[in-house]
């Protein structure tokens, strides 16, 4: 049997796997256990009461967290004319059409989010095999194919997170950095859960949000007592 590292022993000693922690206690514990040499992210896993095998029960969307994610985001926009100018003014790092597509095909992909105006999809459509596997393909369901590219750029810069359930019906995303305050992480989590509830498929029956867990990049998962969150969630 592999020998446990000091870090893993510490996590095992302090995290009760069967306990549901109040949000403040959970965040305090995550901060205590975040000992990596880099600033760890605080990630969330939300188990949904859906049948992920059925297309009408899949959950996908995006929401802007009130306190952002704590990371800087580089945005590429496929647009032309007035939309291109609006994207630049909103802070997009890369803006173009065929010229930008050529850079992507050449492997120049120094960006985290791709946004496109509807008329640019004829160009973006050629990049599906490159952008798709990386989760970068623009999609109207998450607001990255839109006539209002400036607003989409601002949302991306403001800390918008995109979510999509996996084959087990679990949403995985981030709600900030471990250096964020308890208050900010709590409000970001609540905002995400509100968005997920609004996105609940009509075909989903029974308990919708079954379990919420937080973890840091290098840490163990901590289950959250949903009763400790805002009543609006």
Swiss-Prot record:
According to the UniProt entry, the coiled-coil residues are none
Looking up Pfam families in the UniProt record yields: Ribosomal_L1 (PF00687)
Extract the InterPro entries matched here. Answer: Ribosom_uL1_bac-type, Ribosomal_uL1, Ribosomal_uL1-like, Ribosomal_uL1/biogenesis, Ribosomal_uL1_3-a/b-sand, Ribosomal_uL1_CS
Keyword annotations for this protein? Repressor, Ribonucleoprotein, Ribosomal protein, RNA-binding, rRNA-binding, Translation regulation, tRNA-binding
Keyword check for tRNA-binding, yes or no: yes
Q: Which GO terms describe its molecular function?
A: rRNA binding; structural constituent of ribosome; tRNA binding
Q: How does it assemble?
A: Part of the 50S ribosomal subunit.
Q: Which family does it belong to?
A: Belongs to the universal ribosomal protein uL1 family.
The entry's function note states: Binds directly to 23S rRNA. The L1 stalk is quite mobile in the ribosome, and is involved in E site tRNA release.
What's the protein here called? Large ribosomal subunit protein uL1
> Organism source for this protein?
Proteus vulgaris
